Each structure stands twice: as structure tokens, then as C-alpha cells.
Amino acid sequence: MSTILHITASIRGDESISRALSSKLVERLSGTDTKVITRDLSQNDIPYVDADRFAANLSPYTERSPEQQELAAIADTLIEELQAADTIVLGVPIYNFSVPATVKAWADTVARAGTTFEYTPTGPKGKLDGKKAYITVASGGTPVGSEVDFMSPWLKFFLGFLGISEVEVVATADGIMGEGGEEKIASAHKQVEQVAA
């Protein structure tokens, strides 16, 4: 049985293009015995990391206080989702040239030294190798892959930092708010079909 972790982040719900693309990709990648774990970051259920959560996340499980166990519970769950997945599909919009704040909160939460990456004499090394990730990107005005797109390269780098180096991006071209928006969305859907052919 294979496992797909489907992460979405758009606040636009059913109107979201990035969510529609990622959902289509998950559907096409899924087989009869595929387990799909869904995590909707737009629900704002991931708190931002503060000093107490940071300390709890770094504490060995057996040494955590009851308060630390509670603070670290969401991080444990999110990390377990990543560890269990063979494939990660992220549907992420570009907001103000970068990732939604909830995606950054997710990243800060799952980046745990000794668990998802480790420090070595030659530098940090990811511990989640052997997985493949797909990022479906939608942008209203920021051209995906341009010098003002700080989302796509950052997210690819972060996944690589965790050891997920095989990352494929499917994106709407040049922003969809201007002329030809519907054609750009249709083209992105065709990309999904080709990726999962």
C-alpha cells in the first residue's frame, strides 16, 4: 500500500485553483490500495512556533513534561504524516510573492533536528529521503518561476533540506488575473494529466 500526503493551503476553499490542481493530481496518482492523508493548512490549526513550543519540540519524548507533551503534539502528528508518506502533494498559492503564513508555520513545525534532518560534520542532512513531492502552484499576478516568485524556490529548497530532493512543480503560467487566465488554468490541468500519465 502506498501513502500520499495531500497538503493544501489556499484560503479560497472550493474556488482555489492550487487546491483543484493538487486534488486532481492526488486522484490521478492514487491506486486502489492508496491511502491519502489530507492536511488543510488554511484551517489555521497549526500554531506559530514560540519559545515554549520550540523547547518542547527539541525535548526527547521521554523527558517532556505533561505541558511539553501537549505543546509538541501537533508537531509529532505533522512529522508522522510526512514520515508515513511515500508521495507528498502540496497545493500552494503564491501570496504577496511568497508562501502563505500557514505554510511557513507548517515548515517551522516539521523541521525538527534529529527527526526530519540531522547535523553532520559536512552540514545538515535530511532524513526523509526516498520520497517524491509535487507542488501545484497558482498565482494571481506573480509569474511562477520569475525573480519575484519567492515561494517556489523556497519550498523546493525546504523539501530538499528535509531530504525530499525529487520535487516536481506544476504551475499556472504568468499569473491568472490577467488576459488568458482560463487558458492558463486549463494548461495547468493538462500538465497534471501529463505528470500523472
Curated annotation (Swiss-Prot):
Q: What class of enzyme is it?
A: oxidoreductase
Protein origin, superkingdom = Bacteria
Residues that, per the record, bind FMN: S10, S16, I17, S18
Co-factor binding comment: Binds 1 FMN per subunit.
Give the SUPFAM superfamilies listed for this entry: Flavoproteins (SSF52218)
The EC number(s) given in the record are 1.6.5.-, 1.7.1.17
Checking InterPro entries in the record gives: Flavodoxin_fold (IPR003680), Flavoprotein-like_sf (IPR029039), FMN-dep_NADH:Q_OxRdtase_AzoR1 (IPR050104), NADH:quinone_OxRdtase_FMN_depd (IPR023048)
Which Pfam families does the entry mention? Flavodoxin_2 (PF02525)
Question: What are the alphabetically sorted keywords of the record?
Answer: Flavoprotein, FMN, NAD, Oxidoreductase
Catalytic activity of the protein = 2 a quinone + NADH + H(+) = 2 a 1,4-benzosemiquinone + NAD(+); N,N-dimethyl-1,4-phenylenediamine + anthranilate + 2 NAD(+) = 2-(4-dimethylaminophenyl)diazenylbenzoate + 2 NADH + 2 H(+)
What cofactor requirement does the entry state?
FMN
Gene Ontology MF annotations: electron transfer activity; FMN binding; oxidoreductase activity, acting on NAD(P)H as acceptor; oxidoreductase activity, acting on NAD(P)H, quinone or similar compound as acceptor
Family according to the record: Belongs to the azoreductase type 1 family.
Q: How does it assemble?
A: Homodimer.
Task of the protein: Quinone reductase that provides resistance to thiol-specific stress caused by electrophilic quinones. Also exhibits azoreductase activity. Catalyzes the reductive cleavage of the azo bond in aromatic azo compounds to the corresponding amines.
The name of this protein is FMN-dependent NADH:quinone oxidoreductase
Q: What is the lineage of its organism?
A: Bacteria, Pseudomonadati, Pseudomonadota, Alphaproteobacteria, Sphingomonadales
| Name of encoding gene | azoR
